């Protein structure tokens, strides 16, 4: 690969990741804020907080949509621009990549149910419970993708012998030395950003 191609590949990946991290970070903490607003409205019988939760939920859909588009673009870029890394990742660290996808779908399904069931429950409390899987899915999505990132910073769980991957241990790759601090940092900053 020539140096110009590497440079432009880095720039394109950096640009896409810059947009994605903004929306993804907001998307981790906002479900908790919506839940707090709806809970406050329910507990105090205050329609203003219920309306606030409803409007935040609609805005949250936009952040999720932009996150989906940029996340999909990142997946394509990793496959097309960095195939050697993806060959290694596919054999060693694919488990958290798949788990991140599952966590996202978990979040998206319950977000859809939450949005389309306003005023269909006899109690706001029951409706608010739908936000729990949304918040869990958003947080777990961040955890799993951060595990992949921590692997990139402290790779372990495999041996390279004569250019071949051997002794692959996906769980060891997931729980690498960088994982605890990176996951804690990402979750804390995502909640604080929101």
Positions of predicted regions on the chain:
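Polytopic transmembrane helical bundles with strong interfacial aromatic enrichment
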Residues: 1-194
